[in-house]
Amino acid sequence: MIYGIGTDIVAVARLRGMWERHGDRVLDKLLTPQEIADFSKAADKGRFLAKRFAAKEAFSKALGTGVRPPATLPAIAVTHDDLGKPILECYGQLAEVLKNKNLRAHLSISDEAEYAVAYVILEHA
């Protein structure tokens, strides 16, 4: 049964500009430590940030809380399975909320030229 659905679209230039203006200190506000390591290897830094930001925003909308505790940006990670499918991993208090509500997240991310978009479905597992 579906618990919530969320979607978000982000202009790649917006996140690229944020990183160019604020440098690496913005990474701690947006990314998990593993995502920061992945960011350092990314060919297109702005696109990397935009895709993750869109995914995290879409997740917070599906959860129904928006981005606020426990659904903070550094508590949500975008990873990939062996075939490249994007996966959401949650940490800390947010992971406990998902466990207690028996929720599982499904994520789709896409990007084209100027935009990144993400769609999240939260379902009762």
Swiss-Prot record:
SUPFAM superfamilies: 4'-phosphopantetheinyl transferase
UniProt GO molecular function: holo-[acyl-carrier-protein] synthase activity; magnesium ion binding
GO biological process: fatty acid biosynthetic process
GO cellular component: cytoplasm
EC code: 2.7.8.7
Compartments reported by the entry: Cytoplasm
Binding site for Mg(2+): D8, E57
Pfam family, one: ACPS
Class of this enzyme: transferase
Main subcellular location: cytoplasm
InterPro entries hit by this protein: 4-PPantetheinyl_Trfase_dom (IPR008278), 4-PPantetheinyl_Trfase_dom_sf (IPR037143), ACPS (IPR002582), Ppantetheine-prot_Trfase_dom (IPR004568)
Necessary cofactors: Mg(2+)
Top-level taxon of origin: Bacteria
Keywords: Cytoplasm, Fatty acid biosynthesis, Fatty acid metabolism, Lipid biosynthesis, Lipid metabolism, Magnesium, Metal-binding, Transferase
Record field: catalytic activity: apo-[ACP] + CoA = holo-[ACP] + adenosine 3',5'-bisphosphate + H(+)
Functional description taken from the UniProt entry: Transfers the 4'-phosphopantetheine moiety from coenzyme A to a Ser of acyl-carrier-protein.
Protein family membership: Belongs to the P-Pant transferase superfamily. AcpS family.
Record-given protein name: Holo-[acyl-carrier-protein] synthase
Organism encoding this protein: Dechloromonas aromatica (strain RCB)
